[in-house]
Amino acid sequence: MKYFTIFFIFFSLCMFGHVSGAGIRIVNELKNKKTLWMRCYSKNDVLGPTIIPNGGQFTDYFFHNLFGTTRFMCTLKQGPGFSHSQSFRAFKNSGLWDWRAREDGIYLRRIYKTKFDDDTDNLHKEQSWI
């Protein structure tokens, strides 16, 4: 019974991340109708490449692994010439990672809910364009 209790507690903690949701959203908030090229990848998955139109977004919900080691790396490039770019870790462990591409950089807001919303509170600049 003792081992079952330990297993049940461990399993419950691991599954909590799946219930709370995991995902990436990338929103194009660039000016002058610029498009945004994006490509993200993890050890097991590739998202894109795709072009996000001005004002558009890319959203992907997924399950992270039981050990909490899921990582996604992303590369974003500003259109139309795609001369400014940035590569960065877009997801680690859990939660919803809400990224906003703006003229002066790339902003992040982490959400601990089950779905993305349109709130922009708690955004902070995480990356600058190269």
Curated annotation (Swiss-Prot):
Similarity comment: family membership: Belongs to the plant self-incompatibility (S1) protein family.
Lineage: Eukaryota, Viridiplantae, Streptophyta, Embryophyta, Tracheophyta
The protein's name in its UniProt record: S-protein homolog 22
BP-aspect Gene Ontology terms: pollen tube growth; rejection of self pollen
Domain of life of the native organism: Eukaryota
Naturally occurring in which organism (per UniProt): Arabidopsis thaliana
Keywords: Secreted, Self-incompatibility, Signal
InterPro entries for this protein: Self-incomp_S1
Signal peptide start-end: 1-21
